[in-house]
Amino acid sequence: MSLQDKLRAYARLMRIDRPIGTLLLLWPCLMALVLAAQGLPDIKVLLIFIVGVVIMRANGCIINDFADRKLDAHVERTSMRPLVSGEVSVKEALTLFTLLGLAAFCLVLWLNPLVVQLSVVGIILTVMYPFMKRVTNMPQMFLGIVWSWSIPMAYAAQLGEVPVEAWWLFMANWCWTVAYDTMYAIVDRDDDLKVGIKSTAILFGRFDRQIIGVFQLAALGCFVMAGLVADRGVIYGLGIISFIGFAVYQQRLIFGRERAPCFKAFLNNNWAGMVLFIALALDYMI
């Protein structure tokens, strides 16, 4: 394999070609930084968190593929991942995971001790998540914790503490993550049943759309509470209304439980998060 092909395989392993996960991680993190700073966050902190999100999302993909390498060959969507195809060896993947983990940890060393402590918990949660699919029917709920962990870290970086407001945003993102990752899990449900992978899509069964709707409503309520506690105004309120519109559209997409529309609904959450973040930022600026 040429160096160029190897680098492409590494990029695919880290999902550099599929930035949706990075974006879904980034929007709530940026919201946390803006809320904690009550406007423009410290530039150093902002850059550290943006780079950190990119690195940790890549690292999460690596450890996920390592854990699932023997199962991915039996799932249509994942059968050509680099660890399955042999383009990247297990040793190479674990080496890359270690190097990226060290890079992320070096970044947080520029911040206060509370952020460093929270980052250690975050790394442990990241490593644990892929194995949850073997022991619980609710791995998406664990993923919600992992993907929301940057929120208390962001508040800690800006304020040196994690106030109540942060936990409203944490719960909003947790509920939102469970909702959109269940949409994603519906895409793989038939394959997951064959190979024994557990998911909320399987757990919820024929009530999947309704329960996704409950989590969307809960996320909406917590986003509203986060805004109320932070004394946000009309523009943030418009962002909340847009979030409702996106949720309704996603419910229409997943109505038939077909793979392509469900995946489209999952991807649509990027726009929901982006618009809500922009509304929050503008609410402080105008």
UniProtKB/Swiss-Prot annotation:
Catalysed reactions listed for this entry: all-trans-octaprenyl diphosphate + 4-hydroxybenzoate = 4-hydroxy-3-(all-trans-octaprenyl)benzoate + diphosphate
- The domain of life is Bacteria
Subcellular location, in the record's words?
A: Cell inner membrane
Q: Name one GO cellular component term.
A: plasma membrane
Any one Pfam family match given in the protein's UniProt record, by short name: UbiA
Q: Quick one: which pathway?
A: Cofactor biosynthesis; ubiquinone biosynthesis
Quick one: where is this thing mainly located?
Answer: membrane
Q: What GO molecular-function term can you cite, just one?
A: 4-hydroxybenzoate polyprenyltransferase activity
TM segments? Answer: 20-40, 43-63, 96-116, 142-162, 167-187, 210-230, 235-255, 266-286
Question: Topology with regard to the membrane?
Answer: Multi-pass membrane protein
Cofactors needed by this protein, per the record, are: Mg(2+)
Sorted keywords for this record are: Cell inner membrane, Cell membrane, Magnesium, Membrane, Transferase, Transmembrane, Transmembrane helix, Ubiquinone biosynthesis
Give the EC number.
2.5.1.39
Question: Biological process GO annotation list?
Answer: ubiquinone biosynthetic process
State the protein's name: 4-hydroxybenzoate octaprenyltransferase
Organism this protein belongs to:
Shewanella frigidimarina (strain NCIMB 400)
Which lineage is the organism of this entry classified under, starting from the top rank? Bacteria, Pseudomonadati, Pseudomonadota, Gammaproteobacteria, Alteromonadales
